[in-house]
């Protein structure tokens, strides 16, 4: 009896793992048909770049969140956003204010954004960083996620939802390095009917 219980438990574990992998594969296949990662070259001349250079305050500056910039609403884990010359080519950009912090960027549904991308990272070649970047549709369903891992500088991360809208992006600092992370040059494009 005890032997058959052990066999049942071992088989149940195999079945559970198999069910998890199968379910994950089905979910990925379902989403891959309507959403995918893209590059900067996938945006056309109707794309709008929000470079965050001129938010109307002297720098450096700390903003309370939520902070609205055009079609974007920024929130963070700490309730604050740093603003200063930490962006691409030392331009002004927004950053978290805590190590291992997160930043959520909600996109106004009225903007009808189907493609969205941004630069994520830290300035300078010696600023090692890791971030998880998750894209959501306008119903807060996960479209996809990726990791950014660099020895310094920025990486452009972008996503397209071909069957709906991009609703938000969540960036999570994943590197315990006593540093925050920076976002710059938000790129959006809409295909309105």
Where are these regions (language model features)?
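Surface-exposed, well-ordered secondary-structure segments
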Residues: 34-190
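N-terminal signal peptide c-region/cleavage motif recognized by signal peptidases
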Residues: 30-32
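Generic detector of short alpha-helix boundary/capping microenvironments
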Residues: 11, 23, 105-109
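Bacterial N-terminal signal peptides
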Residues: 17-27
């Amino acid at each position: 009896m005890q032997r058959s219980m052990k066999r049942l438990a071992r088989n149940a574990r195999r079945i559970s793992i198999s069910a998890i992998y199968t379910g994950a594969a089905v979910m990925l296949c379902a989403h891959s048909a309507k959403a995918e990662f893209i590059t900067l070259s996938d945006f056309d001349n109707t794309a709008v770049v929000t470079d965050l250079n001129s938010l109307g305050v002297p720098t450096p500056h700390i903003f309370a969140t939520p902070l609205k910039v055009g079609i974007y609403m920024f929130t963070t884990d700490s309730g604050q956003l740093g603003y200063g010359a930490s962006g691409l080519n030392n331009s002004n950009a927004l950053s978290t204010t805590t190590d291992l912090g997160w930043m959520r960027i909600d996109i106004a549904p009225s903007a009808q954004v189907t493609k969205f991308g941004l630069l994520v990272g830290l300035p300078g070649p010696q600023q090692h960083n890791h971030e998880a970047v998750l894209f959501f549709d306008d119903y807060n369903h996960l479209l996809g996620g990726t990791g950014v891992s660099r020895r310094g500088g920025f990486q452009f991360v972008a996503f397209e939802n071909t069957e709906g809208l991009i609703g938000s992006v969540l960036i999570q600092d994943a590197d315990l390095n006593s540093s925050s992370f920076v976002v710059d040059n938000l790129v959006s494009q809409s295909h309105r009917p």
